[in-house]
Amino acid sequence: MSANYIEVQIFGQVLRLHCPAEQQENLRASAQRLEERVALLKDQSGIIQLEKVLAIVALNLNYELEQEKQKNADNKTVLESCIHQLDSSLNKLATTGSIAINQENI
């Protein structure tokens, strides 16, 4: 098999996928996690139709992705605010030689 392709087995089917060598381990782990999530949902819900289970798992994964995107956006906003405060304090220090420390943010 070419170094740019990987075979993974998902739900009893072998898929041959293009994948850079440095990402193959992550792809295998992702396939394993997908199988685990599908099996768990089947057990919990009693749904046996693979297409329905896959659709629900896909929706759940997308929801989780959107939550993580929002967390990242929130973290970015907080970090940008901290950078702005630090920049302002450094500018004030360079100009006046002293700064007042806001104890609430420490």
UniProtKB/Swiss-Prot annotation:
One of its GO terms (cellular component) is cell septum. Its main location: cytoplasm. GO terms for biological process: division septum assembly; FtsZ-dependent cytokinesis; septin ring assembly. Transmembrane segments: none annotated. It is found in: Cytoplasm. Pfam families: ZapA (PF05164). Keywords: Cell cycle, Cell division, Coiled coil, Cytoplasm, Septation. It comes from the Bacteria. InterPro entries: Cell_div_ZapA-like, Cell_div_ZapA-like_sf, Cell_div_ZapA_N. Residues 21-80 form a coiled coil. Belongs to the ZapA family. Type 1 subfamily. Homodimer. Interacts with FtsZ. Activator of cell division through the inhibition of FtsZ GTPase activity, therefore promoting FtsZ assembly into bundles of protofilaments necessary for the formation of the division Z ring. It is recruited early at mid-cell but it is not essential for cell division. This is Cell division protein ZapA. The gene is zapA.
